[in-house]
Design a protein with these regions (language model features):
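Receiver (REC) domain active-site loop signature in two-component systems and cognate sites
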Residues: 63-66
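Alpha4 helix (beta4-alpha4-beta5 surface) of REC/receiver domains from two-component response regulators
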Residues: 22, 70, 93-110, 114, ...
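Conserved acidic segment of CheY-like receiver
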Residues: 5-25, 57
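Active-site beta3 strand of CheY-like receiver
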Residues: 51-58
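Short amphipathic alpha-helix used as the core "switch/output" element in two-component signaling
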Residues: 25-26, 44, 69-82
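Active-site residues of response regulator receiver
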Residues: 59-60, 90
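Conserved active-site segment of CheY-like receiver
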Residues: 11-12, 88-93, 113
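Helix N-cap/capping motif at the beta->alpha junctions
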Residues: 35-48, 68
Length: 139
């Protein structure tokens, strides 16, 4: 990622979270990774005083407490948060999850790959996209 801002990973599965962290290291992404296990915890981080806003949010959908769709509704309704790009990274095969995610203006919807090499390629494409994308100043 071009920015030095953190990446926020919202993922309840510790194995999947470690896989994302490992993939980011393997492709030499140096942004700090902030990991939260559900939407409520992620909102606490985003609203916390002194916490850097992330350059991107990697979001799972199937989580306890506040799931990914509920989290998206809250983030996209908040003027201070709605411009943060969100990429859904999920094992969900539900068509409605994809429809609802894009209705809430996600930047992308990526399936979690079972094969590690394919997963790293997915993370690499996310990184490349956000490295090449030009955001407005101050974003």
């Amino acid at each position: 990622m071009r920015s030095s801002k953190p990446i926020l990973l919202v993922e309840d599965d510790s194995v999947d979270a470690m896989t994302v962290e490992r993939a980011l290291k393997d492709i030499k992404v140096t942004n700090p990774l902030i990991h939260r296990i559900n939407g409520n915890d992620a909102m606490e981080y985003l609203k916390g005083q002194g916490n850097d806003k992330p350059c991107v949010i990697l979001l799972d959908l199937n989580m306890p407490n506040m799931n990914g769709i509920e989290f998206l509704k809250v983030v996209k309704a908040d003027d201070a948060l709605k411009k943060i790009p969100v990429v859904v990274l999920t094992a969900s095969k539900e068509v409605n999850d994809k429809i609802n995610s894009f209705a809430l203006s996600v930047a992308g919807y990526m399936p979690k790959q079972g094969d590690y090499k394919r997963f790293v390629e997915t993370i690499k494409m996310i990184d490349l996209y956000w490295t090449l994308s030009e955001l407005p100043d101050g974003e």
